[in-house]
From Swiss-Prot:
Tagged with keyword Nucleotide-binding: yes
Binding site for ATP: 14-19, 120
Name of the protein this chain belongs to: Shikimate kinase
Catalysed reactions, semicolon-separated: shikimate + ATP = 3-phosphoshikimate + ADP + H(+)
Species classification: Bacteria, Pseudomonadati, Pseudomonadota, Gammaproteobacteria, Lysobacterales
Matches recorded under HAMAP family: Shikimate_kinase (MF_00109)
Cofactor dependence: Mg(2+)
Function, in words: Catalyzes the specific phosphorylation of the 3-hydroxyl group of shikimic acid using ATP as a cosubstrate.
Length: 180
């Protein structure tokens, strides 16, 4: 058993961090928090507008602030944005205050799941596959570096992935307080 006060879901966009995370949070009686939603609430505008008018550095600053605020609490499942792991301080904090679950997905499955998504700023490019491939190459090693558990969600329905994660988490994670 690996005790931690929070569960933290990491992985690329489209992996299921939010949809599966909500189900896992309910099963384990955890508060569900999504960093992207918390950023929108804090900024008072959507993520696309933050990127457009303030730039990615401002978005990443807000992301770091929100993540650290969330991780100061306990009994939560935190679904992070795909790029949250780019900041070394975010990685350190997630490892210290959470049991980190990497939801892994391949680029082709991402393309299928995100085919109709027009809201993610990093996908507003002509060649989405190249963008996702580049993000995968940069971020994959960082996801693996901090993961306590890796679950591949390719070819899994949300129900199947949730059931598998519940089994895996029951075997490997113990909810604790003051684990940091």
């Amino acid at each position: 058993m690996n005790p931690a006060p929070n569960l933290v879901m990491i992985g690329p966009m489209g992996a299921g961090k939010s949809s599966i995370g909500r189900r896992i949070a309910k099963h384990f009686s955890l508060h569900f928090a999504d960093t992207d939603h918390a950023i929108v609430e804090r900024a008072g505008t959507n993520i696309s507008a933050i990127f457009k008018y303030s730039g990615e550095p401002e978005f990443r600053r807000l992301e770091r602030e929100v993540l650290h605020d969330l991780l100061n609490h306990e009994n939560q499942l935190i679904a992070t944005g795909g790029g949250t792991i780019l900041d070394p301080e975010n990685r350190r904090c997630m490892q210290e205050r959470g049991f980190v679950v990497f939801l892994k997905i391949n680029v082709n499955t991402q393309l299928e799941r995100l085919a109709h998504d027009r809201y993610r700023p990093l996908l507003q490019q002509i060649d989405r596959k190249q963008v996702l491939s580049d993000l995968y190459a940069t971020r994959q090693p960082l996801y693996q570096q901090i993961a306590d558990m890796i679950v591949t969600t390719d070819h899994m329905s949300p129900n199947t992935a949730t059931a598998q994660l519940i089994l895996d988490l029951t075997a490997h994670w113990q909810k604790s307080s003051n684990a940091a």
